[in-house]
Amino acid sequence: MENQVLTPHVYWAQRHHELYLRVELSDVQNPAISITENVLHFKAQGHGAKGDNVYEFHLEFLDLVKPEPVYKLTQRQVNITVQKKESQWWERLTKQEKRPLFLAPDFDRWLDESDAEMELRAKEEEQLNKLRLESQGSPETLTSLKKGYLFMYNLVQFLGFSWIFVNMTVRFFILGKESFYDTFHTVADMMYFCQMLAAVESINAAIGVTKSPVVPSLFQLLGRNFILFIIFGTMEEMQNKAVVFFVFYIWSTVEIFRYPFYMLSCIDMDWKVLTWLRYTVWIPLYPMGCLAEAVSVIQSIPVFNETGRFSFTLPYPVKIKVRFSFFLQIYLILLFLGLYVNFRYLYKQRRRRFGQKKKKIH
């Protein structure tokens, strides 16, 4: 009777251009590792789950790979790197849909697709920045200037939103609910300043000064400025409503944790309490802020209908009057889409920061 074929535990991960396999065998001797007809063949003497024996396995890859695997032996395992022929993301490792029992994801090395794309972009940006720095001057000087600029920007924003937060808090304790109705006239100038300055964040992300993705910051910037400049700024009837207080208070609460975190990051400091707050307070505050903004839009619809502001009539032969409230209803949909985009981005940031378990990947 033929001896039973023993297979070792194999863990895999990927990037767009290569595959990583970790074979759990210690004290490996005489390894035979090759790729023929897109099938990886492995056979070696080593100590695995069944003791000191000969272990082997074969894996037919999902897509084409280069036939020259690179492997490295350590005392505890065998690390194999295989280059993909085309740089792309694979939905699984093997051609067969059912995963072999001995194969599992290597969560220590795994990144999901969006993370891998961010890593790829970061590497490309790093190379481009390196070339720019070599041609422009001392890397240390430019890095110091960049950190100084970002530190001052975040400091100014922190002071601005702190002033708004403290002012509104003190007035609430002194005046109670009466403070709700003149919030706009009290803090609007500072909010205008902070929100106009917030455009710099999207510019920084777009030109590569920071590594933040452009889309989430742009969604937040456009959404807030639409509420501030269009809903509140152009309609005096909206400026005396209580919803202004809740919108401004939630915005400022989020920012008095976010900007100090960025300030400390500029000087390579990590205050654990602040870090936890920065990656946690948004969980209740972002939905609350979205709800408050939605209420302000809904309350403004009859006001815009009554005044006819920003409404227009299509030219002949259509001659249909298009009310601005129609666009506000569309905006309500976009508002919750923006919440989803930002929520997803911030959740992934939090997951990476605190090392939560990644989803199971086949």
Curated annotation (Swiss-Prot):
It is a multi-pass membrane protein. The modification Phosphothreonine is found at T7. SUPFAM superfamilies: HSP20-like chaperones (SSF49764). Residues 111-136 form a coiled coil. Pathway: Lipid metabolism; fatty acid biosynthesis. PANTHER family: VERY-LONG-CHAIN (3R)-3-HYDROXYACYL-COA DEHYDRATASE, VERY-LONG-CHAIN (3R)-3-HYDROXYACYL-COA DEHYDRATASE 3. This is Very-long-chain (3R)-3-hydroxyacyl-CoA dehydratase 3.
